[in-house]
């Protein structure tokens, strides 16, 4: 997912739920009307995160972790991880949490279709405070670096040492504060470079 798509998803208004109707009323509707109602309901529920005590705790923990990292000096930071059984909504939860944090961070800039900032005097750059990537099976470090660069609109070709430097520069240039890696278990850790990452 590139930075513009992330921004669009994070700032799009939630889909409205259709007006609830009694089962008796639904049963009297035509097949076409029932299909339309189900389509509206399914569309509105896609990506819906149901509140739970576990989700609230995880949200609080992740928010606190990001805030502590923000206060730390440059260098290594603490890493958060969400782990649970297959298909319980980990990715949906993390995206929901991160997009809420993104909206809070941007504030009035959410209305801008392409937020910008000034990393240094006289320089204007796209403001991309959150970068979200999804790893593919057996991803190597070059694949991760390529995904990060493509997300921010940079060319992804080159030697690992070159693309690593390019990623660091791009993160600094675009004000990246949060890196989200979905399906990190797909990272191929059979070589030292990937394990070091």
Short names for language-model regions:
Residues 61, 93-97, 143-151:
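Alpha-helical scaffold elements adjacent to nucleotide-binding pockets in ATP/GTP-utilizing enzyme cores
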Residues 133:
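Hydrophobic residues at beta-strand termini and immediately following loops
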Residues 1-78, 107-109:
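A short, basic N-terminal segment
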Residues 77-81, 130, 178:
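Residue-level preference for the first positions of well-ordered beta-strands
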Residues 18-37, 115-127, 139-147, 155-197:
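Mid-core helix/loop region of P-loop NTP-binding domains shared across ATPases and GTPases
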Residues 74-96:
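Walker A/P-loop nucleotide-binding motif
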Residues 100-119, 154-155:
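Post-Walker A helix-loop "phosphate-sensing" segment adjacent to the P-loop in P-loop NTPases
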